[in-house]
Amino acid sequence: VTTQQLLTPAEAAELSGFSLDTLRYYERIGLLTAITRATSGHRRFTPDDLAWLGILRCLRDTGMPIADMRRYAELARTEGPAGLLDRIALLEQHDTAVNDHIALLERQRTHLREKIDWYRSLLPAG
């Protein structure tokens, strides 16, 4: 990785959609590891770090709890078939939870639309 490919924390935050505080927190709890440091000691993010942040963004946006995100990060650092199988299982479990949440949201949206239609029916004609 060349220094031109390294991003400041502010750039990584902007591109990932995470705040600087969240990036620091993720590093502190082990979701981000081995962050490169400039000679000044400041953190620098690589393209691989940014790709990893994209995965974390997906997991967070779909409601994965931090504990499960930490487990996923641990498994991502585990080599071999066992680590892969565990990652697949964790992601499949999360996919099921996401599908359940989508189904709930669709039912709630239907309820909202019915309520909107009801209120519109109460308006005077014309």
Q: Residue spans of the language-model regions?
A:
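Arg/Lys-rich, alpha-helical DNA-contact motif
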Residues: 2-9, 14, 33, 47-126
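Short glycine/proline-centered loop/turn elements that form peptide/ligand docking sites
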Residues: 12, 19-22
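N-terminal helix-turn-helix
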Residues: 22-24, 36
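Conserved active-site tyrosine of GNAT-family acetyltransferases
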Residues: 26, 45
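Beta-hairpin "wing" of winged helix-turn-helix
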Residues: 32-40, 44
